[in-house]
């Protein structure tokens, strides 16, 4: 008995001593403490103040220093190598909401460089397609076979002579690579899986319900076909018409806009001033030119970053030159590449601050956004309660296969200024949703003074996604919408008001025509 009491006393005294020592060490900062899970800070998605999960302890944690982006890591993200699984948030909505339409803009997939660096060997890349070569995809062989039936489809005349598959064993300049094809087979398949439970396109879809358009470049046409095949494998060619967009801005008959051109010229002058003032960039170009035995201005004109990105994305060593008559020799380096990429990232930061590009982007993308809004309105009208749907239906799926010079201004015009520059095979998705109709017993919304009570038909909402991420509440027209007030999605009317009126306020104008043709003060 006595021994047991002594043992218990020893345990109590020992525990107390350990507690005192632990508290003393924490007080002296010898043991780091970590906040509990519900107090641990995190980065807000939009770069704002982090919000703690769980109950608020009313404690403020200093935000850690945000490191400068790593130019090389950013470049690998730009490559978008299809070697990992990807989470896509397309097709997500509150229960019982109906998906009415989807409009997608894609940037073409990985391509061969548009420029070559003088005195260096061009990167050796095979642009034919083979399932035995990586990267590959289960749909690659069926896709190749299906493209052989493309003569059954309908093509706008400028596209009829464009090859439907990349086909050169030694890639031509700007040609889509097998990586680019696989990127878009994956993209299309991702959306097919996201929407298959929503019955977006019935099995007996009509030609009127699908709209596919592309610029005249083979890389955009082939990217669009790969995406569409991933989305709708073994589709019926006889139902498909592929339409040509002559402008990379997809502006149709509304491309004439003098003010847009002025803003673009001012933006290009800003870019030039920033480049020539960057002494590190200038030193790097001089070093690279000396290595290759070139004049610095000749190297600049060759836009070496385009070719170097191709080497990086395909795991090919950077170009080297043997000793020549000029005595120059050596290889271009990752450090030199990083300097050029760093300057490009700096340019993106200044571009957002100055605002010239955003003005250009709004005018450049208004025709496309207005067409997007019109399509949504037609689909919404076709789905009104008690209305007889139009014979053949409305366009419920639109695919626009475009370039970086299309998607970058689109992101800016939407107010997504913090979005990363469009990588290879980037995608922007617009989803139109309809809430369930009010049922008997649910209270109706009160009408305004002198107005009629609102019909029981469901309300319309919009989602915007960029590379699978829901960015709706980062857009200009929905940033201030309170999604916790029983409306978890962005009302379509916000988007319509923005496109028809609000986006021209920055020009003190009320319409696209006025903003485009008003004489500068």
Language model segments and positions:
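Signature for phosphate-centric chemistry
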Residues: 2-211, 215-398, 402-521
């Amino acid at each position: 008995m006595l021994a047991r009491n002594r043992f218990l006393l020893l345990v109590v005294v020992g525990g107390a001593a350990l507690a005192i020592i632990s508290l003393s060490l924490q007080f002296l900062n010898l043991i780091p403490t970590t906040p509990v899970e519900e107090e641990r800070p995190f980065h807000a998605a939009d770069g704002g103040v982090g919000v703690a999960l769980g109950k608020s302890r009313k404690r403020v944690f200093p935000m850690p220093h945000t490191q400068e982006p790593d130019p090389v890591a950013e470049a690998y993200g730009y490559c978008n190598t299809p070697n990992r699984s990807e989470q896509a948030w397309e097709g997500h909505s509150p229960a019982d909401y109906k998906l009415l339409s989807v409009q997608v803009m894609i940037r073409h997939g990985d391509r061969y460089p548009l420029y070559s660096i003088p005195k260096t060997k061009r990167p050796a890349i095979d642009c034919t397609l083979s399932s035995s070569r990586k990267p590959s995809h289960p749909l690659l062989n069926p896709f190749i076979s299906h493209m052989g039936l493309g003569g059954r489809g309908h093509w706008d005349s400028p596209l009829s002579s464009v090859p439907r598959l990349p086909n050169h064993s030694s890639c031509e300049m700007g040609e889509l690579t097998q990586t680019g094809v696989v990127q878009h087979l994956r993209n299309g398949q991702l959306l097919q899986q996201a929407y298959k439970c929503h019955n977006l396109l019935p099995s007996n879809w009509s030609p009127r319900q699908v709209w596919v358009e592309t610029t005249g470049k083979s890389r955009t046409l082939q990217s669009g076909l790969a995406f569409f095949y991933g989305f709708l494998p073994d589709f019926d060619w006889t139902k498909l018409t592929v339409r040509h967009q002559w402008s990379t801005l997809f502006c149709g008959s509304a491309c004439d806009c003098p003010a847009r051109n002025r803003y673009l010229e001012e933006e290009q002058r800003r870019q030039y001033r920033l480049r020539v003032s960057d002494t590190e960039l200038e030193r790097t170009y001089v070093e690279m030119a000396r290595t290759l035995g070139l004049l610095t201005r000749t190297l600049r004109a060759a836009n070496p970053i385009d070719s170097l990105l191709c080497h990086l994305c395909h795991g090919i060593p950077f170009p080297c030159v043997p000793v020549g008559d000029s005595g120059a020799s050596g290889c271009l380096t990752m450090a030199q590449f990083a300097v050029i990429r760093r300057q490009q990232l700096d340019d993106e930061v200044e571009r957002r601050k100055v605002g010239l590009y955003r003005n250009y982007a709004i005018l450049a993308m208004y025709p496309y956004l207005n067409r997007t809004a019109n399509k949504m309105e037609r689909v919404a009208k076709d789905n009104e309660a008690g209305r007889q749907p139009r014979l053949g239906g409305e366009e419920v799926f639109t695919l626009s296969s475009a370039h970086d010079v299309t998607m970058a201004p689109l992101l800016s015009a939407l107010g997504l200024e913090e979005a990363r520059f469009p990588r290879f095979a980037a995608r922007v998705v617009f989803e139109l949703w309809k809430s369930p109709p009010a049922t008997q017993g649910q209270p109706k919304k009160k009408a305004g003074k002198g107005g009629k009570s609102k019909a029981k038909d469901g309300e319309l909402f919009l989602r915007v996604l960029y590379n699978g991420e829901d960015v709706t509440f980062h857009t200009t027209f929905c940033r201030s919408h309170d999604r916790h007030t029983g409306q978890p999605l962005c009302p379509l009317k916000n988007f319509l008001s923005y496109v028809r009126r609000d986006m021209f306020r920055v020009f003190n104008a009320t319409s696209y025509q006025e903003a485009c043709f008003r004489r500068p003060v």
